[in-house]
């Protein structure tokens, strides 16, 4: 970056903003890069600004009980704010004085007033000087205020980030990532541009007072008629604004609903294609879009009338001011023209400036209050440690989720004793509730000495991670003691990767030691992976390690923890994503050898790890089930596995575990006795409650894709609210958990940033804490979305006791990754969305405009109609002018004066004919602007265009090949459907309408002036030419700067989300200062771009104004020097010239806005033009001899499965299959050939990342493939894609449940009857689950079906496959996140429902492979072995290495016995389970 020319710029250069000249020249000639941007001045650096504000905020906290952020801001910025306010006021005063001089100039042309004619030229000079002074005052003032707003935003951004790093885990559990981003973007962007309007809250009233005084001098009391009318217009506009908000609020829910389904579709596009659900998804989204557009139209009409009211008021305000005075006393022309000029300024002050200023203050103070409350939240308390301690000791430790939870529970139970629950089963609710009242850990005791390994085991939700949290100080015990040295290293359960190189991720700011680094890389099995990258360990990883596999991320995370030299290593299930072989090697070489002298606590569920541990701690429902050695465990607790896991059978699950499915259901229905109708629930299931108590604006951002554990209540093993630390802070600064009054107003204080009422706790689902505790699959890519459940509207308890219930329900609500926008709204749209770098032309091309206009044929007719109406208006005006001029000449010729007593009354003066002209001037802009027949059809048609474009884009996305999605970020696709479609719906129609209106007003005024004074036309031509050249020159650079600014905004939010996801790791490693520095760097980069954009914008605005001032000077002097007698002509010319000046500037700005918004259109066209999948057969098929398959030829690309005979058996032949993710990319699989007999079961084996899942995708033609596959003799080249995919049933690794009913999820095309669905649900063990929900099959699942465990979702995928009657079943790691019970159900279903199907299974678990007859071993992109289990066990294969000798002995007998013995299902299930316990993760 270069040094900014601002630092050495002269005063003149700063005053006229000529210092950004070089960058404008460069941007016009060539493409701007980041290196071309100037460095920021030191006064704008985030370090300086945040330090200044932090100092004042700390002062505020120290000195007052009730600290106010606005006081800290005042001490930092107040005097500069006042100075710029005064400049702004002086600039505005000149506008009020201009009409006075105008009046005097007009008066000097009165034939009776020849005395003043001599000073007309001096009056004109005075008028022109006023314009020059105004230009010189206004622009520096506005720029100064924008600059100051930017500084305030930077300081607050930094303060919020620093606070986020200090928040206690308990507070983090109450805040969603959506709220954090919303706090930064939606609230803080108000300061950047809003500050310039803030002063009008006092300037506008002063301006109105001054103007009314001046108009009173002219018209006496009748002046107030015009003001009264303007106030009525302003109030009317406020009413219309409220009506518009009402429509938009209604629409917000629909937009949200559409975006949720769209993001689910994009995120799971692979599943959508695998299931052939493209048409079903399109229909669902289009139906929602229809409803949304109806509301969009209504809102647009209201907004159109609101906009038209401003123009329309121009004529009436003058008319109402002048008419009463003229009727009573008569009026001279000078007064009319002066009044018109005064009224133009008055109208702006009353209907625009003052309402905007009030809105700005309202928004800004609201934002400051939210930030203030956030800054006062409870902080993470660093524990005091004894550095000399070598042991790790826990004595009688107990911890609760919430302080005082037990008491709250008792109170809630008493208050609800007599209430009926909607399904009438009281026990369900309270069995869950008692669980929630229990401590997360109770009476934990253990002691481990230096160098020992403690293995912590237990079922999901037993409190394993909470134990590690407590050691780290994230969760404070309510009783008991913890002792250790405090030198901790931590490896999280779900690997966290920061943006940077692999090396930076492992070293993580610790000093570099080559030998240690190499040892760690070797022990964590990373050598081979690193050697594959061209840049080795210096390869830059994207957000969340997007380019790495899950196993690679897990190993880097582990390497980071091991590299740090600590006394105690906390490893939270570090092997979750590793294959058996890698896990075994890392456990031995890293955990047992490399770290042998260190104290380690390992959360695990593997029997081998328990055997090798020095001590074992088994947790069950928060209590210590067992503590001791492995031999003691076998002696004392021989039944530990079945007891802990509930292996005996599903029915013998503990009540808590079984009912976890129901807990969210209960939240949806009122406990008050009146049941809520199902339809109502359905309506509300997408409704978003306000995010911060008042209208929350949008925030849609890329987030993570959560995978959920089996239990809903105990699902995160992390329960991490923490306990309220004993804080020295005053009570007001801490979160109050218990309401002050019995009425239970809110859980947090009223002004709290995140919660202004009890609704928040019920509707929170994805807290920041959950974000930290979820695994990420393609973290940076996957959009995660959340919609509120109906719980947001239905209380769980009577209103008075809501607060206690909220705490209960918050614990239940876990899953989801993101707050989807409450309202897609105006300028905020641009804030939160960050796109990849796109090669967009600097200025929107004419081709885009032409294509946009021709999208809908009626748009062309509407535009032609607009032009016709306009030409008619201009023609009428010219005719009127001609008639007036003729009558004026006749008047002069006859030299007659009409008597005041004649029928005309007192209005008529000796310049009567010109009086009529005033009506034209007054009505000119009203007539052009209102033109209701022109405006409404335009807005209506532009919304139709938006509808068509959305439809085309959706179809294009659904038909795009998977390679497109491999190169496109999901966030970018969702931005098209959210940000860009919202721009097309909301901003573009009205901005375009405004631009067309303003342009026509200017043209109309120029024509009138030119007719009256032809010389002026000569001055107009160069002005218009200058304006066009200047606009083109400026646009080239400004759009590039905007693009760079948008790209620079992305790292700020990415860094925030990344920091929050890795917060425990950050704090365990003490890296907060390093991350604050990185955040400040990201802020400074954004500031450099934004400041330069603001400066170039001011450069442009000032140049435009200078051109207009020159134009006005020319017009004034030409008029004065060439006009003869008669005040009418000079009055019209000067009044219109002043009007042209203001309007043309507005028109120029509108044209820039239109160009900017049209970029959204060009982005959408890019998506519409994407290539599509080849759905037609690649070659024709010869009719088979037996005639059986002839019907294949006539199946068209229909999604409905017809009962033809293909596929009949499921015989599959693969020949020379090669697969790539993208065209021209490296082959992921090469020359794969094998054959599978009908009904055979084949297991895929291979290390992590060997290509097993890729092979399954290749079967479905989801990749770029070469070679051939045949099913029952039919080649994939001979039939359509849809038909081919229909042959397969799929259970993907990433389960797809979209927002909709159970029925829709199982059968989106609605082909099956209820009986068929229930029969299949019975077969797969889903019936009992579905029947527990109200509405049964019609129960609406939202948030990816968060009320279901991962196992139940897998069962739904299984049911889909059974319903599709597929002959070949593909299973991609179905047991990865399953508890043993659900896994057994899946195994049983596979045996029964798919007995005669071909099954291809990809698995990590050895025991999962027991049913397979053949095994396909994939290594180095190709088939290494394809054989039966016996041969693989005899040879030296990967399969043989992966399992222990003991298991090897078991495998063959197990297969034989299980195939030949017949026994009852339950007995078989039980026996199999017990045999497998050795391998199963607890």
Curated annotation (Swiss-Prot):
Subcellular location: Apical cell membrane; Early endosome membrane; Cell membrane; Recycling endosome membrane
Renumbered ranges of motif PDZ-binding: 1480-1482
Extracellular side: 99-122, 217-222, 320-339, 880-919, 1013-1014, 1118-1131
Topological domains, Cytoplasmic: 1-77, 147-195, 244-298, 359-858, 941-991, 1036-1096, 1153-1482
Record field: transmembrane: 78-98, 123-146, 196-216, 223-243, 299-319, 340-358, 859-879, 920-940, 992-1012, 1015-1035, 1097-1117, 1132-1152
PTM remark: N-glycosylated. Phosphorylated; cAMP treatment promotes phosphorylation and activates the channel. Dephosphorylation decreases the ATPase activity (in vitro). Phosphorylation at PKA sites activates the channel. Phosphorylation at PKC sites enhances the response to phosphorylation by PKA. Phosphorylated by AMPK; this inhibits channel activity.
Region (Interaction with GORASP2): 1388-1482
Enzyme class: isomerase
Domain ABC transporter: 423-646, 1212-1445
Gene Ontology biological process terms from the UniProt entry: bicarbonate transport; cellular response to cAMP; cellular response to forskolin; chloride transmembrane transport; intracellular pH elevation; membrane hyperpolarization; multicellular organismal-level water homeostasis; response to endoplasmic reticulum stress
Biased composition (Basic residues): 1454-1463
Amino-acid positions noted as binding ATP 2 in the UniProt annotation, renumbered to this chain: 1221, 1246-1253
Coiled coil: none
Covalent link Glycyl lysine isopeptide (Lys-Gly) (interchain with G-Cter in ubiquitin), residues: 687
Chain spans, region Disordered: 1454-1482
Record region (Disordered R region): 654-831
One protein family per Pfam: ABC_tran
Carbohydrate attachment residues: 894-895, 901, 910
Membrane topology: Multi-pass membrane protein
Cited NCBIfam families: CFTR_protein
General function of this protein: Epithelial ion channel that plays an important role in the regulation of epithelial ion and water transport and fluid homeostasis. Mediates the transport of chloride ions across the cell membrane. Possesses an intrinsic ATPase activity and utilizes ATP to gate its channel; the passive flow of anions through the channel is gated by cycles of ATP binding and hydrolysis by the ATP-binding domains. The ion channel is also permeable to HCO(3)(-); selectivity depends on the extracellular chloride concentration.
Summary of subunit composition and partner proteins: Monomer; does not require oligomerization for channel activity. May form oligomers in the membrane. Interacts with SLC26A3, SLC26A6 and NHERF1. Interacts with SHANK2. Interacts with MYO6. Interacts (via C-terminus) with GOPC (via PDZ domain); this promotes CFTR internalization and thereby decreases channel activity. Interacts with SLC4A7 through NHERF1. Found in a complex with MYO5B and RAB11A. Interacts with ANO1. Interacts with SLC26A8. Interacts with AHCYL1; the interaction increases CFTR activity. Interacts with CSE1L.
Family indicated by similarity: Belongs to the ABC transporter superfamily. ABCC family. CFTR transporter (TC 3.A.1.202) subfamily.
Domains (record comment): Binds and hydrolyzes ATP via the two cytoplasmic ABC transporter nucleotide-binding domains. The two ATP-binding domains interact with each other, forming a head-to-tail dimer. Normal ATPase activity requires interaction between the two domains. The first ABC transporter nucleotide-binding domain has no ATPase activity by itself.
Protein name as annotated: Cystic fibrosis transmembrane conductance regulator
Protein source organism: Loxodonta africana (African elephant)
High-level lineage: Eukaryota, Metazoa, Chordata, Craniata, Vertebrata
């Amino acid at each position: 970056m270069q040094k900014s020319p601002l630092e050495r710029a002269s005063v003149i250069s700063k005053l006229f903003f000529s210092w950004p000249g070089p960058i404008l020249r460069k941007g016009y000639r060539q493409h701007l890069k980041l290196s071309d941007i100037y460095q920021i001045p030191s006064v704008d650096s985030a370090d300086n600004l945040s330090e200044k504000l932090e100092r004042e905020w700390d002062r505020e906290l120290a000195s007052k009980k009730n600290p106010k952020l606005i006081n800290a801001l005042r001490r930092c910025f107040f005097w500069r704010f006042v100075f710029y306010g005064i400049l702004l006021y002086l600039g505005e005063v000149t506008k009020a004085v201009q009409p006075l001089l105008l009046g005097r100039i007009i008066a000097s042309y009165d034939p009776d007033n020849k005395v003043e004619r001599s000073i007309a030229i001096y009056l004109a000079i005075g008028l022109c000087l006023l314009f020059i002074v105004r230009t010189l005052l206004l622009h520096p003032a506005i720029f100064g205020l924008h600059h100051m707003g930017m500084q305030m935003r930077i300081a607050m951004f930094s303060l919020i980030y620093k606070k986020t790093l200090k928040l206690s885990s308990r507070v983090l559990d109450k805040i969603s990532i959506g709220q954090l981003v919303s706090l930064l973007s939606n609230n803080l962007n108000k300061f950047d541009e809003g500050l310039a309007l803030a002063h009008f809250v006092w300037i506008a009233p002063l301006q109105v007072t001054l103007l009314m005084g001046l108009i009173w001098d002219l018209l006496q009391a009748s002046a107030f008629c015009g003001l009264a009318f303007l106030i009525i217009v302003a109030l009317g506009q406020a009413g219309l604004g409220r009506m518009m908000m009402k429509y938009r609020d209604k629409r917000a829910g629909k937009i949200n609903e559409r975006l949720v389904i769209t993001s689910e579709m994009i995120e799971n596009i692979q599943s959508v294609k695998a299931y052939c659900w493209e048409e079903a998804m399109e229909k669902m989204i289009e139906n929602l879009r229809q409803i949304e557009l109806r509301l969009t139209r209504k809102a647009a009409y209201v907004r159109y009338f609101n906009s038209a009211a401003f123009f329309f008021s121009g004529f009436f305000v003058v008319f109402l001011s002048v008419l009463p005075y003229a009727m009573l006393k008569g009026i001279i022309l000078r007064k009319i023209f002066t009044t018109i000029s005064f009224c133009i300024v008055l109208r702006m002050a009353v209907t625009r400036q003052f309402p905007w200023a009030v809105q700005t203050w309202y928004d800004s103070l609201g934002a400051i209050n939210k930030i203030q409350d956030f800054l006062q939240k409870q902080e993470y308390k660093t524990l005091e440690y004894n550095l000399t301690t070598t042991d790790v000791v826990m004595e009688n430790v107990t911890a609760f989720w919430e302080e005082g939870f037990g008491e709250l529970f008792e109170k809630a139970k008493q208050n609800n004793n007599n209430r009926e629950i909607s399904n009438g089963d009281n026990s369900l609710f309270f069995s869950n509730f008692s669980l929630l009242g229990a401590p997360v850990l109770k009476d934990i005791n253990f002691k481990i000495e230096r160098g020992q390994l403690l293995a912590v085991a237990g079922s999901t939700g037993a409190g394993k991670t909470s134990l590690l949290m407590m050691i780290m100080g994230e969760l404070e015990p309510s009783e008991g003691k913890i002792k250790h040295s405090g030198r901790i290293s931590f490896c999280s359960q779900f690997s966290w990767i920061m943006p940077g190189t692999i090396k930076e991720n492992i070293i993580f700011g610790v000093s570099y030691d080559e030998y240690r680094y190499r040892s760690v890389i070797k022990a964590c099995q990373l050598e081979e992976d690193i050697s594959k990258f061209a840049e080795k360990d210096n390869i830059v990883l994207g957000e969340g390690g997007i380019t790495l596999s899950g196993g690679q991320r897990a190993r880097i995370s582990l390497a980071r923890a091991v590299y740090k030299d600590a006394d105690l290593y906390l490893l939270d299930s570090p092997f979750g994503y590793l294959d058996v072989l890698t896990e075994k090697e890392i456990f031995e070489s890293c955990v047992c050898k490399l770290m042998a002298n260190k104290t380690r606590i390992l959360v695990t569920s593997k029997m081998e790890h328990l055997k090798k541990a020095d001590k074992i701690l088994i947790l069950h429902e928060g209590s210590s089930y067992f503590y001791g050695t492995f031999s003691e465990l076998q002696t004392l607790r021989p039944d530990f596995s079945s007891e802990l896991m509930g292996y005996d059978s599903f029915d013998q699950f503990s009540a808590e575990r079984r009912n976890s499915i129901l807990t969210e259901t209960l939240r949806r229905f009122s406990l008050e006795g009146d049941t809520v109708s199902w339809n109502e629930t359905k309506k509300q299931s997408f409704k978003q409650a306000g995010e911060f108590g008042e209208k929350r604006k949008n925030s849609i951002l890329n987030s993570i894709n959560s995978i959920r554990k089996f239990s809903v209540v105990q699902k995160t093993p992390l329960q991490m609210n923490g306990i309220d630390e004993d804080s020295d802070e005053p009570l007001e600064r801490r979160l109050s958990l218990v309401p002050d009054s019995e009425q239970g107003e809110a859980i947090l204080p009223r002004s709290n940033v995140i919660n202004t009422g009890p609704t928040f706790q019920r509707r929170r689902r994805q807290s920041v804490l959950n974000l930290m505790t979820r695994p990420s699959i393609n973290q940076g890519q996957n959009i995660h979305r959340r919609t509120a459940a109906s719980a947001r509207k239905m209380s769980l308890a009577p209103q008075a006791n809501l607060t206690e219930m909220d705490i209960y329900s918050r614990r239940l609500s876990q899953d989801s990754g993101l707050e989807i926008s409450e309202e897609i709204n105006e300028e905020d749209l641009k804030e939160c969305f960050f796109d990849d770098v796109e090669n967009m032309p600097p200025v929107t091309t004419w081709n885009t405009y032409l294509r946009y206009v021709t999208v809908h044929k009626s748009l062309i007719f509407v535009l032609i109609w607009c032009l016709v109406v306009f030409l008619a208006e201009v023609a009428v005006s010219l005719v009127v002018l001609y008639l007036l001029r003729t009558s004026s000449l006749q008047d002069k010729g006859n030299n007659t004066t009409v008597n005041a007593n004649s029928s005309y009354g007192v209005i008529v003066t000796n310049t009567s004919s010109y009086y009529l002209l005033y009506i034209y001037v007054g009505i000119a802009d009203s007539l052009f602007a209102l033109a209701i027949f022109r405006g409404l059809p335009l807005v209506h048609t532009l919304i139709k265009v938006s509808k068509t474009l959305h439809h085309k884009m959706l179809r294009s996305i659904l038909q795009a090949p998977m390679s497109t999605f491999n190169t496109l970020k999901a966030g970018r696709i969702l931005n098209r459907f959210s940000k860009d479609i919202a721009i097309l719906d909301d901003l573009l129609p009205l901005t375009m309408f405004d631009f067309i209106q303003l342009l026509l007003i200017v043209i109309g005024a120029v024509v009138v002036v030119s007719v009256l004074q032809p010389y002026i036309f000569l001055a107009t031509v160069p002005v218009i030419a200058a304006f066009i050249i200047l606009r083109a020159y400026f646009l080239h650079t400004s759009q590039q700067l905007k693009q760079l600014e948008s790209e620079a905004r992305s790292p700020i939010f990415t860094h925030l989300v990344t920091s929050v996801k890795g917060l425990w790791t950050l704090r365990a490693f003490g890296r907060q200062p390093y991350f604050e520095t990185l955040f400040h760097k990201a802020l400074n980069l954004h500031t450099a771009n934004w400041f330069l954009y603001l400066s170039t914008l001011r450069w442009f605005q000032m140049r435009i104004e200078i051109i207009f001032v020159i134009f006005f000077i020319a017009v004034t002097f030409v008029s004065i020097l060439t006009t003869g007698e008669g005040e009418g002509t000079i009055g019209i010319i000067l009044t219109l010239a002043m009007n042209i000046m203001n309007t043309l500037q507005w028109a120029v700005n509108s044209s820039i806005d239109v160009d900017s918004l049209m970029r959204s259109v060009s982005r959408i066209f890019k998506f519409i033009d994407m290539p599509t999948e080849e759905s037609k057969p690649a070659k024709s098929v010869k009719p088979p001899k037996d005639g059986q398959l002839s019907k294949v030829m006539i199946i068209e690309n229909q999604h409905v499965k017809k009962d033809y005979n293909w596929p009949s058996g499921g015989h599959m032949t693969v020949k020379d299959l090669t697969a790539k993710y993208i065209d021209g990319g490296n082959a992921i699989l090469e020359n794969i050939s094998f054959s599978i007999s009908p009904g055979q079961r084949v297991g895929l084996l291979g290390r992590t990342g060997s290509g097993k899942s890729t092979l399954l995708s290749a079967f479905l033609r989801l990749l770029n493939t070469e070679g051939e596959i045949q099913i029952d003799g039919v080649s994939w080249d001979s039939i359509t894609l849809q038909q081919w995919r229909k042959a397969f049933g799929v259970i993907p690794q990433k389960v797809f449940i979209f927002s909709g009913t159970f029925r829709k999820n199982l059968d989106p095309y609605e082909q099956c009857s209820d009986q068929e669905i229930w029969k299949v649900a019975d077969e797969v063990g889903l019936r009992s689950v579905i029947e527990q929900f109200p509405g049964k099959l019609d129960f609406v699942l939202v948030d990816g079906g968060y009320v279901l465990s991962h196992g139940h979702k897998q069962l739904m995928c299984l049911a889909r496959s059974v319903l599709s009657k597929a002959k070949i079943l593909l299973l991609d790691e179905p047991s990865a996140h399953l508890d043993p019970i659900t896994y057994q159900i899946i195994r049983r279903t596979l045996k029964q429902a798919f007995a005669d199907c071909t099954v291809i299974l990809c698995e990590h678990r050895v025991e999962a492979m027991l049913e397979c007859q053949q095994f396909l071993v994939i290594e180095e992109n190709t088939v290494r072995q394809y054989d039966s289990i016996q041969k693989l066990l005899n040879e030296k294969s990967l399969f043989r290495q992966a399992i222990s000798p003991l298991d090897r002995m078991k495998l063959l007998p197990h297969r034989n016995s299980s195939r030949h013995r017949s026994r009852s299902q339950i007995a078989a299930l039980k026996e199999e389970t017990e045999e497998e316990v050795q391998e199963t993760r607890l």
